[in-house]
Amino acid sequence: RDVLGSRGLGDVYKRQGISNVGIVAKSNFQSLMDHVGSGSAYDLSKRRSNLSILPPYDGKAFSSFVETIYNMHGYIEHCREEYVLISQGNVITNIDYTDVFDFHSKKKADITLIYKNHAIPQGYDRPITLDVDDDGKVNQIFVKPGVVDKEAFNHAYGSILIKKDLLMSEIRNAISVNQLDVKRLLQSSLGKYSIYAYENKGYCATISSINDYFEFNMDLMKKEVRDELFNPQRPIYTKVRDDAPSRYGLTSNVKNSIIAQGCVINGEVENCVISKGVYVGEGAKLSNCIVMQDTKIGCNTNLNYVIIDKDVTIKDGRSLMGYDSYPIYIAKKSVV
């Protein structure tokens, strides 16, 4: 859900990566633990770096941001770093946090919010939008009751840089008066603290619905998006699975798709994102699909605008067709 990254400002010049990361998990986090593991894939399993999974205490997901931070106080206060960087887990971007720390320090800000000027995703019922002056100072914080299509707003998407002591002080005060809404908490802080906003000018996608997830994956077909996200100056690390290279049969035909290793492709694939270990049978036609790992797609199938979760079996001859604004979702381990 949320990533709490913390480090001192002095460390920011040594490296881009944050060396102490806590991931706040929801109630079912087995897949998350399997993916991040010990943190070794992200260079976070060494003596001076750490990755922690922070599950809810009673097995239930936290109901609010304020409650989440309050219940993580033991982890946060145990960290030796002076600053905390909070980031939402549903935001896809590749941002240089060194620049954010430099901005925060230069402005002598108490709180820095990171925002993107764009049309707000439809899944946000009450997004936080900002009125920012030319110097980056936040004049007003709005909680928008609805979303206006095709209009650009300064959307604060949930990334916050703040001193650890200030964060915990405000969270305790909010809990004491039962103020659990982070939007209202930020609004009440505007008169007390110096709040600045840093604009993320790169690619930024927020995933709040199946449609958002589908649109983001389709964006990966665009070279400019891939170049932005997979910037060699800020490489993205992930869990490694040692698979053989993907094999393309004589009957295969692949266009404008991203295909991971370990796949066997014998059919036609166009505008698709296909994860590791996927099998596509002869005569199968896949268009505008997202197929997750270890899925088996039978012969002579016809799939269009379909999102398929892990370990799914699509039997021979099946046809499934969604639409760009309403893709079909097939749950994990289903048999169709």
Where on the chain are the PLM-derived regions?
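Active-site acidic Asp-centered loop
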Residues: S87-Q88
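Short phosphate-binding loop-to-helix
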Residues: D34, A41-R80
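Short aromatic/hydrophobic "clamp" motif used to bind/position activated sugar donors
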Residues: V84
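Left-handed beta-helix
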Residues: D165, N173-V336
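A structural motif
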Residues: Q16-I18, V269
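Conserved core of the sugar-phosphate nucleotidyltransferase
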Residues: N94-D165, S169
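Single conserved hydrophobic/aromatic residue that forms the stacking wall/gate
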Residues: D2-L9, Y13
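Short internal beta-strands
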Residues: G22-K26, I114-Y115, I307
